[in-house]
């Protein structure tokens, strides 16, 4: 177990050592960007540290409607609703969806979308897709809800959804796009850029604002009727609102986000080039580079740590899950950082 007294950026101070940090998230690196931190400070001075009232109360803060309008536009949906965390947003979405039909979970769906403790499918995803299409099309008297992630950061995979075109009945499709929003698509609109437009799929998108944007908060976007129903739920009315300063900083940072997204894409491309002939796995050009597992002593994690390079390696999403070795790239990294990582991976034999 490693400890630090500082928040990591491209590096992290650990036990008196300044180590390269290839772990965590905050893909755009905004949490360490001076301009973004200045906007957060300005937002705090303008709005304080919280909005001290329920969003269902008789006094409303117009800032929330501004960010919800901007997010629904970005995500190409009719309406959006923001929460104080991505987990809360996902839980609100799934607790709404459970009343819309039988939940059909995709394999390895993130725990944020779990309704209680669902029995997730154990088969591979393609088999699950075939069975799901057959089940929905063969049961015209039933209502179904498809539940899935759009991006799996543990396997560095972007899931495809073109198979939704094969459905002959209308379904609600609840998708967690936490690792897509801000990263994928020409304007950072996320996975909606490649989701199929079909009359039988009604999308309800949920996402954390932390993974790309470095903000504690979450969003659910979809059809206006679904969002209106969510606003009548205790998840919305009884929870503390998104910190206003976070909403302010997000609304003021459009150009900065695009700049940092371009830097991130350049860094991803550079490390893809360096690792092209290695066992590093990243087929979709995500910020997540999957590293092979070895039984060596020392382990790859310890080998890199001894050389002041920290990668991601821990059991997730559950304590008994197998640790996954990953190198996470952000917009903050320099080419020399990735060259150093590549050098040590080569020395280890990756």
Which residues does each predicted region cover?
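PLP-dependent enzyme catalytic core of the Aspartate aminotransferase-like
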Residues: 30, 34, 41-46, 62, ...
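N-terminal "arm"/small-domain region of PLP-dependent enzymes with the aminotransferase-like
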Residues: 1-52
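Conserved N-terminal alpha-helix of the aminotransferase class I/II PLP-enzyme fold
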Residues: 37-85, 268
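Conserved PLP-binding catalytic core of the aspartate aminotransferase-like
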Residues: 265-272, 276-308, 331
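Conserved PLP-anchoring active-site segment centered on the Schiff-base-forming lysine
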Residues: 83, 93-113, 133, 264
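Active-site phosphate-binding strand-loop segment of PLP-dependent enzymes
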Residues: 125-174
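Conserved PLP cofactor-binding pocket of PLP-dependent enzymes
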Residues: 57, 307-328
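Active-site C-terminal subdomain of aminotransferase-like
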Residues: 172, 179, 184-276, 281-283
């Amino acid at each position: 177990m490693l400890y630090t007294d500082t928040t990591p950026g491209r590096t992290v101070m650990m036990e008196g050592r300044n180590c390269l940090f290839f772990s965590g998230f905050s893909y755009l690196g905004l949490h360490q960007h001076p301009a973004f931190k200045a906007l957060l400070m300005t937002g705090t001075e303008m709005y304080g540290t919280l909005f001290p009232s329920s969003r269902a109360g008789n006094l409303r803060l117009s800032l929330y409607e501004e960010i919800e309008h901007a997010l629904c536009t970005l995500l190409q949906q009719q309406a959006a609703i923001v929460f104080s965390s991505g987990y809360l947003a996902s839980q609100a979405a799934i607790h709404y969806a459970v009343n819309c039909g039988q939940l059909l979970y995709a394999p390895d769906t993130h725990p944020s979308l779990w309704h209680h403790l669902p029995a997730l499918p154990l088969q591979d995803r393609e088999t699950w897709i075939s069975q799901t299409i057959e089940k929905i099309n063969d049961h015209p008297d039933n209502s179904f809800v498809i539940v899935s992630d759009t991006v799996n950061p543990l396997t560095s995979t972007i899931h495809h959804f073109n198979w939704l075109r094969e459905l002959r009945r209308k379904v609600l499709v609840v998708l967690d796009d936490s690792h897509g929003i801000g990263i994928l698509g020409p304007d950072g609109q996320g996975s909606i850029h490649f989701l199929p437009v079909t009359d039988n799929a009604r999308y309800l998108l949920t996402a954390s604002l932390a993974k790309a944007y470095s903000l504690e908060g979450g969003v659910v976007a979809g059809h206006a009727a679904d969002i209106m129903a969510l606003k009548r739920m205790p998840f919305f009315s009884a929870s503390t609102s998104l910190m206003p300063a976070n909403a302010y900083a997000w609304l003021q940072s459009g150009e900065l986000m695009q700049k940092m997204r371009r830097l991130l894409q350049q860094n991803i491309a550079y490390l893809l080039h360096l690792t092209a002939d290695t066992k590093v796995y990243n087929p979709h050009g995500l910020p997540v580079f999957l590293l092979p597992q070895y039984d060596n002593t020392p382990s790859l994690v310890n080998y890199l740590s001894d050389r002041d390079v920290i990668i991601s390696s821990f059991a997730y999403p559950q304590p008994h899950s197998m640790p996954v070795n990953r190198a996470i790239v952000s917009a903050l990294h320099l080419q020399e950082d990735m060259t150093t990582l590549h050098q040590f991976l080569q020395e280890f034999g990756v």
